[in-house]
């Protein structure tokens, strides 16, 4: 399995000097560089145009931290990122095999499930086109959360602790993925109450176990949510851009065409997803209730990514936080891989035939992956947000153009955008360009002839920020200036 995951990784990242892609890769490179000094403080001034972005307060990083370790070792952002993606793919295929075996009860089916899940179109898009590495990590954790929730609710296993640990890992990975997973677990809980047929004893057990899991999750994730909420309580924080859900949802036809072409520049389920929607229809009559629910979940999670669902009805609800309905395809990856694994189990019986089928499936996945990569190389250069990450432009992308430059910035600071961009200092009422020196966890401005005047620095101020004048701590007044 590790070899298969390695071949999958090498196929897309063959050059350790250059990455040609799009999406959020510059943002995540800046995160790696910024996190390299996390033990000196949560703010790093060498990234995000030296503004002192508080991204680490609002964007969890625990599961992304191995990339930082690789950066410490290699001192190369590109190499550290490629190594991390390789590690992520290996961990994904191994974990999916482990939990697939727990759920499917057959080694061959678990093997197929882990391969399908790793190679799935939408997961590949998340990693190699969108460069949405946090969401890709979340796709590794979500099946674990769902398994323990299922085991606790339907198999009546005492899984409160592993459910809390896996949910905590998800929170430490990506908040929006956590939000969607909470909804999914909520639907499982609702189904559990329906199945229990209002039996009081079972309902009480379920409530107690879930309460334990929730309580432990809150405690385990306090390291992330406490500083974040303190920042929000102190001042207004600029949120990432909001979107119109109906507009961002996919056309059904575009989704199908993009999937059949396994086109990574579209946000679709890919060819494996198409097979997961069609192939199970030939086995549907032989499915048991659980298998039918999984198949219907695969279909529904795909439909929810399209304009088939009236997303405009949810625009003014908390659901709008997901920004893009096609993010729900992360669950289609899980349900689609599971139902195809059940199809494999039902269509394969003889031991010799199993080996042949598994070998053929793996070779086909590798061949399709190679063809997809070749097609992507031609299409990505035509994308509006295409960029080439190499040593020549790393500083420019991680410092000046990382993406999300003003995400999570204090709202009050946005009125000074022009002066921020020019790194101007206000002395009294006049703005001036002053020399400054940037270090990992601090920035030093040299300001002359300012005695008795208020100074406004082009730096974001968060709860916990310390300002010093000539080595002495000074009061920060109204979050904009230093006395």
Where are these regions (language model features)?
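Periplasmic/ER-lumenal interhelical loops and adjacent helix-loop junctions
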Residues: 206-210, 214-283, 393-407
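Membrane-interface transmembrane helices that cradle and orient dolichyl/undecaprenyl
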Residues: 145-159
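Active-site lumenal/periplasmic loops and adjacent helix-entry segments of GT-C-fold
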Residues: 5-141, 148, 176
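Membrane-interface helix-loop-helix junctions at transmembrane boundaries of multi-pass membrane enzymes
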Residues: 108, 197-210, 278-302, 351-352
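Membrane-interface alpha helices of multi-pass inner-membrane proteins
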Residues: 148, 160-175, 213-219, 300
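Active-site-proximal, structured, solvent-exposed surfaces of multi-pass membrane proteins
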Residues: 414-483
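Perimembrane helix-loop-helix junctions
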Residues: 181-216
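Membrane-interface helix-loop junctions at the exits of transmembrane helices
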Residues: 6-14, 35-43, 109-128, 220-239, ...
């Amino acid at each position: 399995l590790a070899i298969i995951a390695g071949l999958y990784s090498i196929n897309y990242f063959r050059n350790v000097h250059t990455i040609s892609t799009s999406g959020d890769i510059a943002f995540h490179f800046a995160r790696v560089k910024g996190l390299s000094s996390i033990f000196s403080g949560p703010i790093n001034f060498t990234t995000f145009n030296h503004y002192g972005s508080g991204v680490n307060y609002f964007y969890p990083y625990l599961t992304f931290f191995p990339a930082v370790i690789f950066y410490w070792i290699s001192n190369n952002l590109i190499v550290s990122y490629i190594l991390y993606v390789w590690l992520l793919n290996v961990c994904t295929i191994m974990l999916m095999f482990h939990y697939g075996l727990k759920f499917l009860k057959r080694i061959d089916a678990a093997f197929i499930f882990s391969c399908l899940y790793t190679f799935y179109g939408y997961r590949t898009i998340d990693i190699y086109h969108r460069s949405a590495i946090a969401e890709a990590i979340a796709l590794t954790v979500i099946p674990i959360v769902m398994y323990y929730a299922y085991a606790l609710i339907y198999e009546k296993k005492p899984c409160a602790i592993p459910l809390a640990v896996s949910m905590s890992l998800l929170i430490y990975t990506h908040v929006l993925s956590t939000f969607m997973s909470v909804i999914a677990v909520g639907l499982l809980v609702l189904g559990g109450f329906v199945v229990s047929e209002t039996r009081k004893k079972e309902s009480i057990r379920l409530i107690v176990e879930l309460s334990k899991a929730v309580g432990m999750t809150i405690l385990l994730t306090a390291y992330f949510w406490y500083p974040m909420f303190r920042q929000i309580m102190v001042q207004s924080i600029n949120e990432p851009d909001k979107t119109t859900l109906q507009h961002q949802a996919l056309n059904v036809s575009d989704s199908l065409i993009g999937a059949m072409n396994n086109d990574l520049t579209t946000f679709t389920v890919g060819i494996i997803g198409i097979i997961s929607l069609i192939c199970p229809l030939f086995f549907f009559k032989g499915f048991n209730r659980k298998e039918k629910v999984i198949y219907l979940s695969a279909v529904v999670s795909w439909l929810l990514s399209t304009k088939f669902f009236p997303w405009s009805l949810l625009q003014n609800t908390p659901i709008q936080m997901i920004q893009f309905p096609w993010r729900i395809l992360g669950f289609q990856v899980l349900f689609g891989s599971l139902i195809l694994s059940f199809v494999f189990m039902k269509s394969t019986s003889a031991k010799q035939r199993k080996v042949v089928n598994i070998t053929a499936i793996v070779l086909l996945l590798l061949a399709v992956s190679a063809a997809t990569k070749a097609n992507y190389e031609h299409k990505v250069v035509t994308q509006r947000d295409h960029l080439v990450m190499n040593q020549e432009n790393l500083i420019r992308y991680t410092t000046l153009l990382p993406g999300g430059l003003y995400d999570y910035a204090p709202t009050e600071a946005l009125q000074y955008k022009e002066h921020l961009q020019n790194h101007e200092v206000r002395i009294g009422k006049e703005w001036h360009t002053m020399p400054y020196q940037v270090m990992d966890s601090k920035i030093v401005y040299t300001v002359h002839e300012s005695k008795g005047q208020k100074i406004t620095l082009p730096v974001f101020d968060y709860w916990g920020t310390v300002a010093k004048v000539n080595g002495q701590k000074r009061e920060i007044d109204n979050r904009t200036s230093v006395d």
